[in-house]
């Protein structure tokens, strides 16, 4: 994240405005799923930018992916998860720490290999279709269809879509989220502001299928949103007033230039110093 480009002045002004409103909500514990206005603003953003409609009651605000996975783990009983291989080491540690069974599922140039999900009797598949970490692969349209078909074959199967790095695609039209083609409500959607704004924001969110929302409300009525009310109201204003979209557009241009600069240096070094051509894996997207 480029800290110099963070909209510090805007955040400072919004913070002052929120305090000046003398809102009593700041003194009390908010809704367990997060501030309603923030959830509604995220729903509007998802419709405009990621291509799918969701209701605010399906959205849960939290302070990190690990918290969201704790919720997901509690929704299911002894299911086998499928993790992309390779993936971020944090996820394997997260699953091991919580004693959750998982299988490492191979990747090819189109994304996760669906046949392996069947082979290992996986019921919950965790995928990063917008920009896989660490390979940089964007899941193909045909593989997305195949993955959704796999989920639709069994009522107990679900897909966890981590829309990691989706804001930063530098060439061509943005690809809609996997959730946008999920007509049977089989995708659990994860989003975060840590990459798009700053890791210090520590606000992430989860969109639950309606069938799982009922289970969540029954099993986790005690699980209170860990994000301070003040932070949620500041982020709501940042989104509502149009600053978030402007920030994303600005950062997309900046990161594209940085990526092009880095790629040119690598190619120049490889041809002049190493005397060989190199292949750069991954799409023109994301921060890695």
Regions found by a protein language model. Give the residues of each.
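Conserved N-terminal helix/loop that builds the PLP phosphate-binding region
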Residues: 1-22
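Conserved core of the PLP fold type I
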Residues: 15-156, 166-167, 173-181, 255
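Catalytic cores of nucleotide-enabled group-transfer and carboxylate-activating enzymes in metabolic
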Residues: 60, 176-177, 217, 235, ...
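Walker B catalytic acidic pair
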Residues: 162-163
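Active-site PLP attachment segment
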Residues: 179-216
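Active-site C-terminal subdomain of aminotransferase-like
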Residues: 213-231
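Structural signature of PLP-dependent enzymes
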Residues: 217-220, 241-263
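Conserved glycine-rich beta-strand-loop-beta hairpin in the small C-terminal domain of fold type I
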Residues: 253-263, 274-288
């Amino acid at each position: 994240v480029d800290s110099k480009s963070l909209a510090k002045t805007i955040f400072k002004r919004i913070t002052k405005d929120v305090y000046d409103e003398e809102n009593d909500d700041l003194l009390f514990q908010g809704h367990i799923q997060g501030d309603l206005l923030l959830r509604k603003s995220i729903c509007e953003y998802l419709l405009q930018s990621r291509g799918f409609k969701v209701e605010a009651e399906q959205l849960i605000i939290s302070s990190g992916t690990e918290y969201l996975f704790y919720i997901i783990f509690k929704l299911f009983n002894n299911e086998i998860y499928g993790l992309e291989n390779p993936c971020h080491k944090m996820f394997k540690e997260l699953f091991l720490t919580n004693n959750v069974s998982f299988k490492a599922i191979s990747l090819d140039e189109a994304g996760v290999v669906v046949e392996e999900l069947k082979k290992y009797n996986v019921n919950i598949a965790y995928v990063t279709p917008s920009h896989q970490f660490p390979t940089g692969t964007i899941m193909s349209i045909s593989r997305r269809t195949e993955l959704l078909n796999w989920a639709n074959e069994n009522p107990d199967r679900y897909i966890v879509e981590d829309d990691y790095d989706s804001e930063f695609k530098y060439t061509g039209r943005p690809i809609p989220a996997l959730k946008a083609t999920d007509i049977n409500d089989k995708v659990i959607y994860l989003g975060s502001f840590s990459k798009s704004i700053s890791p210090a924001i520590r606000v992430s969110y989860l969109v639950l299928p309606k069938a799982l929302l009922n289970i969540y409300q029954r099993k986790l009525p005690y699980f209170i949103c860990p994000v301070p009310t003040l932070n949620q109201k500041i982020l709501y204003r940042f989104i509502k007033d149009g600053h978030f979209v402007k920030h994303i557009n600005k950062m997309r241009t900046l990161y594209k230039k940085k990526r092009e600069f880095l790629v040119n240096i690598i190619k120049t070094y490889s041809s002049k110093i190493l005397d060989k051509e190199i292949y750069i894996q991954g799409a023109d997207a994301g921060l890695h």
